[in-house]
Swiss-Prot record:
HAMAP family, per the entry: Ribosomal_bL19
Origin organism lineage: Bacteria, Pseudomonadati, Pseudomonadota, Gammaproteobacteria, Thiotrichales
Keyword Ribosomal protein: yes
An MF annotation (GO) of this entry: structural constituent of ribosome
Protein name according to UniProt: Large ribosomal subunit protein bL19
Amino acid sequence: MKNKFVELVEKSQLRNDLPEFNPGDSITVNLWIKEGDKQRIQAFKGFVLRKRNRGLHSAFTVRKMSSGMGVERTFQTHSPLIDSIIVEKRADVRRAKLYYMRGLTGKAARIKEKV
């Protein structure tokens, strides 16, 4: 049970401008990157490997293949560094956590698209 003051502060920090997405969906995460005194937006495109729903502490992991090597990045859902999330494709998967995809390559690593 959380303190009512903590709940009130956390509720004000939650973002409601992000789209709904699920594990397996192909998404593009546009996030702010700071290099020295400059800021720019960088896109990270891949599929959602897992999603953790914990209110303000929610997070999701996106996996992509870069030069034949798998790259995973975990994002805090309500982070101010995330500019936008674009859902490219919806997937039809039977698991909530797609850790088995780490060991698959080529055609075996394909995800069925939701019709």
